[in-house]
Amino acid sequence: YSDLSLLSLSTGDYGNLAPLMQQLMAVNCGYPVSISLPSVRAGKLNAPLMKIIKKVKKTGFTIAPEAGSQRLRDVINKNITEEDIFNTVNSAFELGWRNIKLYFMNGLPTETDEDIQAIADMARRLATIKTSGKGKSTISISFASFIPKPHTPFQRCAQIHPDKAAENLNFLKQQLRHPGINIK
């Protein structure tokens, strides 16, 4: 095998993640094996844990801000700040990662055009962070439509209209014509 993946809804919240990663590194250290983590809350993937992962082949990793503005992250109870996001990306680049994926939602309750603009602003600022060593870095933006789920605070909220979803995506594509930024 060449890739070892840890799967869960919230891997970063697992209290024994660092010891688990140390054991996985010990077993796989001499092999060309990459360790993949699912989307991790910014701030949970700290520098000491990233140094452990760095010992084997690095792939990109994903951070899920879900919203570009702090206002909207507060609405959806996503308890991370822009500083958390920037610190995590900066640490990743300093430790040699080249590919960072950011996951955002389109059509969250109370979302405004300013919130969509904030995604573009954040991506452009993140793309200016310098990497250590050689090679170029890439910020990949994944932009998926919000779908209300049952038994959640937003279960009765309307889903974004397809025309508005497409408009938001096209806006971001126009705004993010920037070297080192990909959008899907």
Please annotate each region the language model reported.
Residues Y1-K101, M105-S140:
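Conserved SAM/AdoMet-binding glycine-rich loop
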Residues F93, I116-K184:
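Auxiliary Fe-S-binding modules of radical SAM enzymes
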